[in-house]
Amino acid sequence: MNAKFILLLLVVATTMLLPDTQGAEVIKCRTPKDCAGPCRKQTGCPHGKCMNRTCRCNRCG
């Protein structure tokens, strides 16, 4: 019983610490300008970086 409780707490803590899944869709890019439109649709903010040919969207504020 005690081991199951600890495992449950570990799972809950892990899911709380993981980043939001918003913007998890893979967006292919070549330049940061390619990320502005798709990032605006996903996060409401056009801020994004093109890293390893995938967009990484940032949130505003």
Swiss-Prot record:
Which tissues is this chain's protein expressed in? Expressed by the venom gland.
Q: PROSITE patterns annotated for this entry?
A: SCORP_SHORT_TOXIN
Disulfide bridges in this chain = 29-50, 35-55, 39-57, 45-60
Instruction: Point out the signal peptide segment.
Output: 1-23
Keyword annotations: Amidation, Disulfide bond, Ion channel impairing toxin, Neurotoxin, Potassium channel impairing toxin, Secreted, Signal, Toxin
The main place the protein resides is secreted
Please indicate if the UniProt record lists Signal as a keyword: yes
Could you tell me which InterPro entries the record lists for this protein?
Scorpion_toxin-like_sf, Scorpion_toxinS_K_inh
Question: Which cellular compartments is it found in?
Answer: Secreted
Modified sites of kind Cysteine amide = 60
> What are the record's GO terms for cellular component?
extracellular region
Q: Molecular function terms in GO for this entry? A: ion channel inhibitor activity; potassium channel regulator activity; toxin activity
- Gene3D superfamilies listed in its UniProt record: Knottin, scorpion toxin-like (3.30.30.10)
Keyword Transmembrane helix part of the UniProt annotation: no
Query: Which family does the record claim for this protein?
Result: Belongs to the short scorpion toxin superfamily. Potassium channel inhibitor family. Alpha-KTx 06 subfamily.
* Function per UniProt: Blocker of voltage-gated potassium channels.
Note what the entry says on domains: Has the structural arrangement of an alpha-helix connected to antiparallel beta-sheets by disulfide bonds (CS-alpha/beta).
Recorded protein name is Potassium channel toxin alpha-KTx 6.6
* Organism from which the protein derives: Opistophthalmus carinatus (African yellow leg scorpion)
